[in-house]
Amino acid sequence: MALEYDWSGDTEVDTATLRAFIAATIGGDQHPDGTIFLSGMYVTARAVTGNDVNPAIALFGWEERFSATFRFANQASQKTTEHNIALMAHMLIAFAQRYGGNGVLLYNGDEAVLQYGEDGVTFSSDWEDWSENDEVAPLLTQFANTALPQPLL
């Protein structure tokens, strides 16, 4: 089973801008279909409207306007996977700082592991993968690190 993180946010951003930002920030290669590839990971991202909006995201207190899925190759080395997870975390921080709004990163679609909004970026203190990742752990001293609400669990 592949490792997967889902990111949703309420920022008004079009699909092309979202994909370009992700690709530039993580150093990925965007293919003609919009999928962003990086060794050991690929990302799909799009603005959502109407029936494409995930109503469950409203449990976080805002309406989903875009979504992205980060899928990690299960055949990649642990070092590659950890580096890609760090790139993902840095990209979310950069997006929050540049575009603002609210967002949440879910592990396998239901466990909130990172959130951002008016109060800044917050890492889930219950998610040990953050502190065990040498590239992410330093971020835990720069940003809030506390238990996050888990309305989907």
Kindly give the residue locations of the regions a language model identified.
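Short, extreme N-terminal segment that most often corresponds to the first beta-strand
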Residues: 1-37, 148-153
